[in-house]
Amino acid sequence: MAEIAVEVVYALPERQALLRLSVPAGTSAREAVLLSGIAEAFPGLDVQGCPLGIFGKLLARPEERVLETGERVEIYRPLIADPKEVRKQRAARARSEREGG
């Protein structure tokens, strides 16, 4: 069976990893993460259940998404802060600064 070249990436604030590997054609995004062995470098990483994406787009079903040559599978972490709440806080600060502080 033919092999394709893909990348698997994961980043923490203090450390990042980009792994290039060859996988059999027909490999899913989840399978590529498992084959990469990235869990060995990041012991707390749940490779079975973590959200995955390709080039910044979240995959609804990474177990079913078959990879193409050159694609980068991204492993996503949970958000530290709720984006809506951060925007509200930023708007409130800006409003109070406009009103004189």
UniProtKB/Swiss-Prot annotation:
TM helices/strands, residue ranges: none
Domain of life: Bacteria
Gene3D superfamilies found in the cross-reference section: RnfH-like
Leader peptide range in chain numbering: none
Similarity section: Belongs to the UPF0125 (RnfH) family.
Protein name (record): Protein RnfH
Gene (UniProt): rnfH
